């Protein structure tokens, strides 16, 4: 059991952005969110695009197709129309094998190349679309989500630096985020009803670990910059779905 906790904590805490970079990014997104949903959507799209271009180990030419698909899909969220975004996402998904076939030079199988391109644009695109649409409906829910992620990752980094707390860092970081969620609901900083605390607490407690492990095991093989947004990757779309289905 002790070895399992140590291995899980090591994998869980492996995908971390620098505290300074994450603080600046979170502040920038919250500032854009305070201006409006459109500004937020453009900002998060440009931010993820810039980070991926700066940190990718693939040439700009080779990185062009997945980043183009990402931008087209991500910016569809600006229209605040889930059906439109779904159609754009499906079209991009269907076109991915064709793009992989055109760019395949025999160094990898078509299936591997297709999955490589998909992992580079679909998860960050889905994150951007979902948060942009949610921002158009209720910006406070997006602000709460960004704050929860920030303090979760902050707690994770602080615990990971202490040998005594390192193996328990996933539990302590998630507990801190859930406590912050409870506090936000108690002082009515969010439209989430008090009776929905436990479903959203479960979302935070289980969504972040799943998101971080999924990112490390699958996404970062192609899109290295995914390490910077590991906690957001799957949690963002799930948070949006829960907010739209249960709150708004």
PLM-predicted stretches and their roles:
Residues 2-225, 236:
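Membrane-embedded alpha-helical bundles of polytopic integral membrane proteins
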């Amino acid at each position: 059991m002790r070895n399992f906790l140590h291995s899980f904590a090591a994998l869980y805490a492996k995908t971390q952005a620098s505290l300074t970079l994450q603080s600046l990014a979170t502040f920038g997104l919250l500032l854009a969110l305070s201006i409006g949903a459109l500004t937020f959507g453009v900002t998060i799209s440009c931010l993820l695009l810039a980070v991926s271009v700066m940190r990718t180990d693939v040439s700009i030419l080779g990185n062009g197709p997945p980043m183009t698909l990402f931008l087209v899909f991500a910016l569809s969220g600006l229209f605040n129309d889930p059906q439109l975004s779904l159609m754009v996402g499906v079209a991009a998904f269907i076109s991915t094998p064709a793009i992989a076939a055109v760019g395949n030079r025999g160094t990898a199988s078509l299936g591997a190349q297709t999955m490589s391109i998909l992992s580079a644009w679909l998860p960050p695109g889905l994150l951007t679309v979902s948060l942009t649409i949610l921002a158009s409906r209720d910006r406070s829910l997006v602000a709460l989500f960004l704050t929860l992620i920030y303090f979760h990752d902050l707690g994770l980094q602080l615990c990971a630096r202490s040998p005594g707390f390192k193996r328990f860092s996933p539990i302590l970081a998630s507990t801190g985020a859930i406590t912050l969620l409870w506090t936000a609901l108690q002082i009515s900083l969010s439209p989430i009803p008090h009776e929905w605390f436990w479903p959203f607490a479960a979302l935070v407690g289980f969504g972040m670990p799943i998101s971080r492990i999924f990112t490390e095991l699958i996404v970062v093989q192609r899109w290295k910059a995914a390490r910077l947004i590991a906690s957001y990757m799957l949690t963002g779309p799930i948070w949006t779905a829960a907010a739209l289905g249960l709150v708004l």
